[in-house]
């Protein structure tokens, strides 16, 4: 079996799904043209970063969807320690995949490709490792190390 770039595949599939939803629902941009993920990225490149800009609108929409899916996942998790219920692991896994759908949509709406996402992830991972090595806590929290991640 050939090795594939799975993160790239996820980003491609999600972009295609989003474009299909925009088309099916006849969602349009402020210019009246049919909306697609490329249009959101182009708005980013034009610097349309204000509260009424297309990127902000769709980042907000995808964040709300992500929060909704997180709430659905939370409903699947048991908290009554006195209960004899068991978790539905299959549905929990599906809810986690739903979270990935909207996390990927957020990344795409922020103009990230799979490669850019991976690069930022590994840079932030190094920051997190360094924080742990230094005994990270609220008292030592310094967001300046995040500023160097570009």
Language model features with spans:
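Flexible "arm" and connector segments at domain edges
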Residues: 1-150
């Amino acid at each position: 079996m050939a090795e594939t770039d799975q993160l790239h595949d996820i980003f491609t599939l999600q972009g295609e799904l989003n474009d299909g939803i925009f088309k099916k629902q006849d969602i349009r941009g402020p210019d009246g043209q049919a909306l697609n993920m490329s249009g959101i990225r182009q708005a980013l490149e034009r610097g349309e970063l204000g509260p009424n800009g297309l990127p902000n609108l769709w980042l907000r929409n995808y964040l709300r969807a992500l929060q909704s899916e997180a709430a659905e996942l939370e409903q699947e998790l048991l908290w009554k320690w006195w209960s004899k219920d068991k978790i539905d692991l299959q549905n929990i896994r599906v809810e986690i995949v739903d979270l990935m759908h909207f996390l990927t949509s957020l990344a795409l709406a922020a103009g990230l490709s799979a490669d850019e996402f991976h690069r930022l992830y590994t840079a932030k991972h190094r920051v997190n490792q360094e924080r742990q090595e230094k005994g990270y806590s609220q008292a030592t929290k310094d967001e300046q190390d995040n500023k160097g991640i570009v």
